[in-house]
Amino acid sequence: MNLSGLNMRGLLLADEPMSRHTSLRVGGPADLFAIPEDADDLQGLLRQLKERGIPWLAIGRGNNLLVRDSGIRGAVISLERFNRVEALGQGRIRAGAGAENLAVVRFAQEQGLGGIGFISGIPGTVGGAIRMNAGAYGTGIMERTESLTLLHDGNVREFGRDELEYGYRHLDLAAGDIILEALFRLDQREAEQTEEEIRKDLELRRAKHSVGFPSAGSFFKNPAGQTAWRLIDATGMRGERVGGAQVSQVHSNFLVNTGGATAGDFLELSRVVKKAVLASCGVTLEEEVRIVGEE
């Protein structure tokens, strides 16, 4: 794999440990870690990677990502510099994929807009939230999304929400599509009301989800009509440990890094939990975290 001579305006790092770029603090090295400056820089990099036959993976802040210990062959592309947020009028806000969720909510608040306060306490970026249709309390972020700007087949294109397929904790995108921006349509709302929504969301999440160790948030999706944490609790798996990975004592749908964990520890703990839930409850859990890297 020829990685030498790649040219871009942003930052290029070789053999970069992915443990530095995931909230779980695990993961082997990426052959190449790239941080493009903007869409033009990204397009130029992708053209070079395609010419050389180098595979790539785009990420946000790594809050919902589990990278295997062998790392990632090819390039990892971080969209952290795609963080611009702007008001367009008529209740619309455009946010780059790399913009932090809470920062977008705060920006909307300054414009007298609200309706996405439920993402205030969700760690990560707009791109990651959209990719997983992140939500809380029965609402998903796609319900507030008017359109997405994607890098699609190498070209920048805007897709209306009615052109996209999405559901609980997922958005169906074509292979190779990269989310660049989201256009939200929000409600007129007093800043004080939005502040109260933010405060309640952050307090509730701190009370329920402050687990004290690095985690990826909810590790498993909630099966239809059920909650993953109740199923895990029913098996007595709260506190179960494999190496440095543990089922959180605070919230049993959080798998946490108590120190020195490997990706292999998390994968094995996930397998043990899924096996126990299937045997005890007859339900097959599905990971909500995105698992990537060399097997």
Curated annotation (Swiss-Prot):
It is found in: Cytoplasm. GO terms for cellular component: cytosol. Its cofactor is FAD. Residues 25-189 form the FAD-binding PCMH-type domain. GO terms for biological process: cell division; cell wall organization; peptidoglycan biosynthetic process; regulation of cell shape. Belongs to the MurB family. This is UDP-N-acetylenolpyruvoylglucosamine reductase. It comes from Pelobacter propionicus (strain DSM 2379 / NBRC 103807 / OttBd1).
